[in-house]
A protein has these predicted regions:
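Sequence-structural signature of mature extracellular/luminal beta-sheet repeat domains
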Residues: 707-998
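Active-site-proximal segments of catalytic enzyme domains
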Residues: 561-573, 577, 583
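Ankyrin-repeat and related helical/solenoid repeat scaffolds used for protein-protein interactions
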Residues: 251-253, 264-292, 297-301, 635-638, ...
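C-terminal, well-structured subdomains that either form a transmembrane helix-short loop-helix hairpin
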Residues: 409, 576-578, 584-599, 654
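Long, distal/terminal scaffolding or interaction modules
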Residues: 580, 604-609, 613-619, 623-637, ...
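Active-site proximal loops enriched in glycine and acidic residues that flank catalytic Cys/His/Asp
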Residues: 245, 266, 412, 578, ...
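Conserved metal-binding segment of the jelly-roll/cupin
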Residues: 74-81, 85-87, 93-97, 407-420, ...
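Extracellular "leader-to-stem" segments immediately downstream of a signal peptide or signal-anchor
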Residues: 2-76, 84, 89-164, 168-171, ...
Length: 998
């Protein structure tokens, strides 16, 4: 009998600590040792955790102390009961984290002063237990609410309780921004008003009991989506959630014994996405929709199980409802709003419902988010000699810890590394503050500097169950090869609360005797004059010099939650390629990049919830928010794409896709406060289809949509294949007839496939490509501009730029154009990211029997030495991987529009661009040129030769001459051509790069 009682007690304990979608246990049962943190203990503060002593003033003093001394950091709260009687203010970047066998609990005492009456001048008409603010609130000051610049604030592993006599009490006010969250918090509201007012950024594993509302909220700050994973609502008197423009996406929500789950405020809209969730005993409508059939209303449910929910939705304006007769049923899908079944469908307002009756409610999913490993298994990184002082090289200590142990706790500190940290299959790196805890590179760290392929600071295992939590990744400003994290772990892996440092979101770290720099916002404006001009400020010369911040590749996947990747120094914030492993993104903010925020290439089986992009005025005027190539089976939910109020130029599109199928956009929001919202929400480049609505509840890219212009084989007909380019040039073909070209300033390399008749983005490396070519083995050769990395020394000296003797003779060599050099790298077009290799420079003449030499298509020689320099033999050439293709190294490579192939024994044509003529030369076995003769008095940038030896010249239009120089005709093209190449399966199709068109 004693044994049976024990079993019953254990079961009761489990019932008390596990409620459907959430668990109520302490996730930090042991004290995390962190020398940078503060601990709210009787040893440090005059308190008792007995639930009787009022600790309000001591708690506020402790929080303010962390802010004053550290500016960002953690106040650890040990297990116990803490009585408070007034509002506690938590300023930017301060986190309250509980620990102990049981979660600590803060209790608002009965009849606490000020909580009995509605606060008329308060936004939420209430008084709060904990209010997250933008700064420390001094005595007598009005609090400045948390907002768009309130980062890194949090409360975790703490319970809150409102005792009787506080009818206008709300436990939390959380209008904060990135890397701020509430997690593992249960709120016992009782007779109080609500658990939380004004959602922000992200919530995880939260439970609300009682109250008028669990959550009531306005628009998040500053209008971003909000992710809530694993949540429980029970016993609210009015609604589980009351909302207006909240942008909530929710996975694994359980609502029970409530009059309504979602009550949207009158005359407001919302974007609500709900998946894998449960409603039980909802006496009124599950969702109250007040502005039905408005494009701003986007209500989407997937796999929602209901018991005793007779009314799924009520539409107040029309006084209609969606009733369900079944006692227990599954909402397979519910879509309300503006919808398109495919990209060429007519947008229509619809309410689509797919419901099936079921016999019983399924067992609710306990938790959607992977659990951290047991805390007893953690080892502290500091015990391995890591200093975290920002100066000591901690690489060896960190790697030794990884090699010996799986679960590594990383206390706050800035850990300098000089080599890639490589995770084992079960490595889990756990921090608790992504700005206070950073892995950092010094400027020009040798292993990450100069030219080379992408090199990660942190590299996961391939196919492992890795975790990276609560740690910032700082690649510095100038480290050309740097990637923040390369992620190849499996579908069960987990990345959470990771900040890619750089650009916005930086905080001052106090230093003894050093004053914090003052902001520039309130300086008086200067007035420009010819004698004292005022230049626009804010441009950082280091922007866009590194690879991607977060790179998921080689079948990497898993869960990525609460990620902020806004380093303007990176090519883009998030790049996923070559993976079919399931991946889930929960709340990812990607912002402030120069060319591209997000890129997906050859990705399938991913779900993306609450992705938010933002383009800033100085850095992001030309930035493409999302780029997708060759992807399928990808779902976006609550996708927000935003341009800031300071942007003053239009941009083409927000999502640019090529060769994609079954891409679902559920709740799409393309917006800005300015008139320069991106013109098109979604654009299919190959099919020339644009989606004009900026607000959509549902859009499906099927991949079966027809081309808007059919591609025919009619001889002489010009087909536009793609647009939305800037300055397309550098055209080349491989042995199969596929065509490649580049966009120099935007640093993009494109491929046209002759098999699929479609364009794709092949590469967007930080290097600046100008011309492309192929060797005999189909290695893609990329001629690119290379600027020496500032601060990077080799053997104590800066990188040397070779002095080219042919700089004389062209005025282009002035004005800074001799401060860089041209180099060539090769890649395998099937795997460009992993195969980057710099071509060696070897003496001309080293290769006796050249397969082909590659020369500039055009030269600008305005000092009239074109004839001499064209047959001049430079000292060095670049040697391709095949060992027999060369590129003689001329200064003119820095300005040429393409590389033309010179085959020994065949005539070679090139353009004297300044004198506007084509010349003809002979090609020797060693690839050198001789016997220059004038061919035709026409020429500009590119040219091409067909199988019959006819010459095609780009010069405003395309002019055709036979091999004797006789004019045969002209091809009119819709835009000024730059470079030409024959390709296609038969090699008989002329491909043309214009400026913005292909």
């Amino acid at each position: 009998m004693k044994k049976l009682n024990t079993i019953i007690l254990i079961l009761l304990g489990m019932i008390c600590t596990q409620l459907y979608a959430v668990q109520l246990n302490s996730i930090y049962p042991l004290k995390p040792n962190d020398s940078e943190a503060f601990y709210f203990t009787p040893e440090n503060y005059p308190i008792k955790a007995d639930g009787k002593m009022d600790v309000s003033d001591a708690l506020q003093a402790a929080i303010n102390q962390v802010k004053k001394e550290k500016n960002f950091g953690i106040l650890f709260i040990p297990e116990g009961k803490y009585k408070i009687s007034k509002t506690i203010y938590i300023p930017t970047a301060i986190r309250l984290i509980g620990y102990g066998k049981n979660r600590p609990e803060f209790i608002l005492a009965k009849n606490s002063p000020g909580f009995q009456e509605e606060v008329a001048d308060d936004k939420g008409k209430a008084k709060y237990m904990f209010w997250f603010t933008g700064a420390v609130v001094k005595e007598g000051e009005k609090p400045r609410d948390a907002g768009a610049s309130t980062f890194y604030s949090a409360m975790s592993n703490i319970n809150l309780r409102i005792e009787d006599g506080n009818p206008h009490a709300v436990a939390l006010r959380t209008h904060f921004a990135q890397h701020s969250f509430i997690s593992y918090v249960a709120v016992y509201i009782g007779k109080g008003k609500a658990g939380l007012f004004d959602v922000g950024n992200e919530l995880e594993n939260v439970a609300f009991y009682g109250g008028d509302y669990g959550i009531y909220t306005t628009k998040a700050s500053p209008g971003w989506p909000v992710m809530m994973v694993d949540s429980y609502f029970e016993g609210q008197r009015v609604a589980a959630l009351r909302c207006q423009e909240s942008g909530l996406a929710m996975v694994n929500l359980y609502a029970k014994n409530v009059p309504a789950v979602f009550d949207i405020d009158p005359n407001y809209c919302d974007k609500l996405f709900l998946e894998n969730s449960y409603f039980e005993n909802v006496s009124g409508p599950a969702v109250v929709i007040t502005n039905e059939n408005n494009s701003n209303n986007q209500i989407t449910f997937r796999n929602v199980y209901c018991k005793n929910v007779p009314t799924l939705a009520k539409y107040t304006r029309s006084n209609t409802a969606t009733h369900v007769a079944h006692k227990i049923y599954k909402v397979k899908s519910y879509d309300h709003g503006l919808q398109m079944d495919d990209m060429v469908d007519m947008p229509e307002y619809e309410t689509l419902v797919d419901i099936e009756p079921i016999q019983k409610m399924p067992v609710a999913q306990l938790m959607d988010i992977p659990a951290l490993p047991a805390m007893a298994t953690w080892v502290n990184l500091r015990e391995f000699g890591a200093k975290g002082d920002g100066e000591t090289d901690d690489t060896k200590a960190i790697q030794e810890a990884i090699d010996k142990y799986d679960n590594i706790y990383v206390p706050q500190g800035w850990y300098r590394i000089t080599e890639t940290l490589k995770m084992k299959p079960d490595t889990k790196l756990i921090g608790l503050h992504p700005f206070g805890t950073q892995f950092r590179l010094d400027e020009s760290t040798a292993a990450f500097s100069g030219f080379g392929g992408p090199k990660a600071m942190v590299e996961s295992s391939e196919g492992g169950a890795n975790m990276l939590v609560g740690i910032g990744i700082n690649t510095g400003g100038y480290n050309y090869r740097a990637v923040g994290v390369k992620w190849m772990a499996n579908a069960d892996s987990y990345m959470n609360d990771v900040k890619f440092v750089g650009g916005h979101g930086g905080l001052w770290k106090p230093k003894p005797g050093v004053e914090e720099p003052r902001g520039r916002w309130n300086r008086p404006a200067r007035i420009s004059s010819p004698d004292n001009p005022v230049a626009a400020s804010g441009m950082d010369l280091a922007w866009d010099n590194q690879y991607w911040s977060l790179w998921v590749t080689n079948n990497g996947g898993g869960t990525f939650k609460d990620i902020w990747t806004a380093s303007t120094y990176a090519t883009n914030g998030f790049y996923a390629n070559n993976t079919s492993t399931p991946g889930r993104i929960y709340a990812m903010s990607i912002e402030h990049h120069v060319r591209n925020e997000v890129r997906f290439s050859k990705v399938s089986n991913w779900k993306v919830y609450c992705m938010q992009t933002e383009e800033e005025s100085r850095e992001s005027t030309d930035c493409q928010p999302i780029e997708m190539d060759d992807c399928k089976d990808v779902t976006f939910a609550n996708l927000y794409m935003f341009r800031v109020i300071r942007v003053n130029e239009p941009y083409h599109s927000s999502v640019r896709i090529r060769n994609c199928e079954n891409i679902a956009f559920l709740n799409l929001h393309n917006y800005s406060q300015i008139k320069y919202t991106n013109n098109i929400a979604v654009f299919d480049v190959n099919k020339d289809i644009d989606i004009r609505p900026w607000e959509l509840s549902r859009l499906i890219v099927t991949g079966k949509e027809p081309h808007q212009q059919s591609l025919g084989n009619e001889i002489g007909k010009v087909n536009q294949l793609a647009s939305d380019l800037e300055f397309a040039e550098g055209i080349a073909r491989d042995s199969k007839g596929n065509i490649y070209f580049c966009d120099h300033r935007m640093r993009r390399i494109f491929k046209w496939s002759v098999e699929t008749n479609s364009l794709s983005l092949l590469a967007d490396f930080p290097w600046k490509p100008s011309n492309l070519a192929f060797d005999s083995e189909d290695n893609l050769l990329v001629l690119f501009r290379y600027d020496a990395q500032p601060g990077y020394l080799i053997n104590g000296k800066p990188e040397e730029m070779p002095v080219m003797p042919d700089t004389k003779g062209t005025s282009f060599s002035g004005y800074g154009n001799s401060a860089y050099t041209m180099r060539v790298y090769s890649i395998d077009p099937e795997n460009p990211e992993e195969t980057i290799k710099l071509l060696p420079r070897v003496p001309m003449g080293q290769v006796k029997n050249v397969y082909k030499a590659l020369y500039p298509s055009n030269r600008w020689r305005d000092f009239h030495d074109f004839n001499a320099v064209s047959v001049y033999v430079p000292e060095m050439c670049f040697l391709a991987p095949d060992g027999k293709t060369i590129i003689p190294h001329y200064f003119d490579l820095s300005r040429s529009s393409s590389l033309l192939e010179a085959y020994p024994g065949k005539p070679f044509y090139t353009s004297d661009e300044y004198d506007r003529r084509m010349v003809k030369m002979d090609v020797a076995n060693d690839g050198t040129l001789s016997n220059l003769s004038y061919f035709v008095e026409q020429g500009e940038f590119g040219s091409a030769v067909d199988k019959e030896g006819n010459l095609y010249i780009a010069d405003g239009e395309i002019y055709i001459f036979d091999k004797d120089g006789k004019k045969k005709g002209m091809i009119r093209v819709p835009e000024r051509p730059s470079t030409l190449q024959f390709g296609g399966k038969d090699g008989n199709t002329l491909f043309v790069t214009g400026r913005s068109k292909f």
